[in-house]
Amino acid sequence: MKTNNTFLSYFVCGFLLMGVGLGQNQTSEIKVGVVLDLNTTFSKICLTSIKMAVSDFYADHPNYLTRLTLHVRDSMEDTVQASAAALDLIKTEQVSAIIGPINSMQADFMIKLANKTQVPTITFSATSPLLTSIKSPYFVRATIDDSSQVRAIASIFKFFRWRRVVAIYVDNEFGEGFMPFLFDALQDVEVKRSVIPPEAIDDEIQKELRKLMERQARVFVVHMESSLALRVFQIARDIGMMEEGYVWLMTNGMTHMMRHINNGRSLNTIEGVLGVRSHVPKSKELGDFRLRWKRTFEKENPSMRDDLNVFALWAYDSITALAKAVEKANTKSLWYDNGSTLSKNRTDLGNVGVSLYGPSLQKAFSEVRFNGLAGEFKLIDGQLQSPKFEIINFVGNEERIIGFWTPRDGLMDATSSNKKTLGPVIWPGKSKIVPKGWEIPGKKLRVGVPMKKGFFDFVKVTINPITNKKTPTGYAIEIFEAALKELPYLVIPEYVSFESPNNYNNLVYQVYDKTWDAVVGDITITANRSLYADFTLPFTESGVSMMVPVRDNENKDTWVFLEPWSLELWVTTGCFFVFIGFVVWLFEHRVNTDFRGPPQYQIGTSLWFSFSTMVFAHRENVVSNLARFVVVVWCFVVLVLTQSYTASLTSFLTVQSLQPTVTNVNDLIKNRDCVGYQGGAFVKDILLGLGFHEDQLKPFDSAKDADDLLSKGKSKGIAAAFDEVAYLKAILSQSCSKYVMVEPTFKTGGFGFAFPKNSPLTGEFSRAILNLTQNNVTQQIEDRWFPKKNDCPDPMTALSSNRLNLSSFLGLFLIAGTAISFSLLVFVALFLYEHRHTLGDDSEDSLWRKLKFLFKIFDEKDMNSHTFKNSAIHNISSPMTHKTPSPSTVQITPWPQSPSQNREFELRRVSFSPSEERFTTQPIIHHEDGESDIECRVEQ
């Protein structure tokens, strides 16, 4: 009995151990729901990839303890049915994750359901950016968000310099979610909208496209489902919108899917179209998978022939990532709470359960990283990232890659990553010329041009007598045609003349009633005219001013020569002349006989020397170094002063010749003088507003008429002419000596071109005018039409001349004064040092007597000077020891009798002419101190 019990015990233990071993080798089943539109080719392609992903993954990982089991539901291409299918999977199958939805419209409710039940919902094809705004950690986008491509699109626009675009999009969540991001990326581009309903019939699409043909836009960005986009392109081709000059650009999803619609035959419809699509790197694994997928798909769907698309690759990678995540996540909580068992109604939202496995699965899924078939699988904030986009050009049945775009490098050539450019493009109509992006409907722009009676330099219409063709020329026309060349698109103008030149208001109004597409000429921008048309930026100087004759000043102002300098400058200069004469006398009178003699003689000589430097005519020689230094400094000052005075005097004489006869408008009104204005201009309204009477106003039609009226004077003609500054400058450029333009200037808008309200051409032409102005083209055109005479001074500059005042030369006088003062100090110091014994002797004389004696010494000759030493030697050696002049060349002139009978005489040579020498005698003066002056002067 004991033996039987022992055997039974061993048998039970062995059975239990076998059960434990078998339990360790069992795998956990993870239910995964799949919601697809099973009747569509797109969903069948993706479902094949999903099934192959499960099979391939576990074939490569046989030891994994988890297994995905797929539960597929058909959404029947209906948003409500897709939501019902997801709810059924959660309530009846208690799935741990859902693959779907297939499009963005089905996603809204499914995301909210996933958030409530904590069931991760993974989409590989819903790309609308609006889904990101639904904050749910359980929604994972394993595909590219449409907003990630807008920067690549913006780079294309910048590269081709397109400034206008029409965004054609489908009227649902898929289309509307993309538009805000496109608008933000194209901030420098004007974006217009065109909405196509998802159920639109061909007639509705054609009607919308014909509206776009009537606009000026020729660049279109298309964002909609591929099937609808194909119809749009087919209709666009039928009505002529796929011809030369048009630009079509498709977004990412459409570019990927166009080849798969209608079995690839759709590429002929979209020839010349550009596209942006996410880059899928080539690999051996991808090539092998394509072959296997094609065999599997044709086996499952024998009647279908299609190719693998990028969304099927993302579906494959999504399943691979999910399989990795469930293996990593904790599988101990693979159940729902009791909520799902409270009701058997599959659509009862109130009793839906909550997955306890969801949080750990969501966390594990967000951390998965690997290189999949579509590239790197890496989620950031629940979204797949695409670091690279391809720029595609559809040519024939080919998809040519013409470039790439990355966030770091921007656009790159497809053949070289170093080139920031794109490859050659074949545009619609098989054109190789880059479209400018805009075109005027009807091919030509009807431009109204006024037929003027004068001022033909601005606008002139010439009529060919044979062909009756009208050709406009002039400054305004050349500015307009130069601006045309700056536009990023082709505009062909058709000029039509306006036969009422005296009524520019009517001319502008005809832009409002669509008679003209634009008005070009000398059209002044006014507030009243801006009510009916939009104006470009002005291309001329703005303002209305007054032109008057200049005075006939044959007799100039008597004292005009004093005008260049101010009073303080005259006084300062005169004081410096006196000061310089005094300083030179101080330095020279002890060593230079030219500065000696009676007091009045010394004063006259000093002043003569100083003032003669004004014209550099001083003949006295200076012998002391200090005096020479002072003279050099002062001559420089005099040079600057005289040159400045000459220039200023010339300016003042010019100003006098340009003095206007009238300077005040109020004087004209008060004196009831007649004034002129250009007929048909708004200037008449300004003059009436200032207070002029109707009988004071006389119109003129041309510059010659204005000249005739002004020449007659105010008694028979006019006292002043009022007009736009541009007209007055044109007159002055040829008659600068007769007239002058004076203040005040009444501000106006200047000349501009008129376009219909809200016309995009207004902004384009304004930018073109700015470019012309910045590049100096406007000034060059103005110089050609209004050349200035070389001898014409600028009246505004001449009338603004100012006197030169002391502050203009304060630095110069400061330098000269400092140098002269320094010389004085040196001179005084040397003199005191030389006669220091006079002040420092031990005699009992008072300081006053010593100073008097010192001044007496200062007034005497400095016999120690080299000048007097040389003279003494010269007198001793002549004429005894030298050749005696012949009697015919020597004249002895007796000195007048004086009380002194012992006066000595010296023989003075008064001529060193080779043919004649004359000598004169001059007494030798004896001083009280026993010294004598011996003078030997050479006169020439």
Swiss-Prot record:
Membrane topology annotation: Multi-pass membrane protein
Residues with attached carbohydrate: 25, 39, 115, 338, 345, 528, 771, 776, 805
CDD domains registered for this protein in UniProt: GluR_Plant, PBP1_GABAb_receptor_plant
TM segment ranges: 567-587, 597-617, 629-649, 812-832
Stretches assigned to coiled coil: none
Main localization category: membrane
Function noted in UniProt: Glutamate-gated receptor that probably acts as a non-selective cation channel. May be involved in light-signal transduction and calcium homeostasis via the regulation of calcium influx into cells.
Protein name, UniProt field: Glutamate receptor 2.9
Origin species: Arabidopsis thaliana
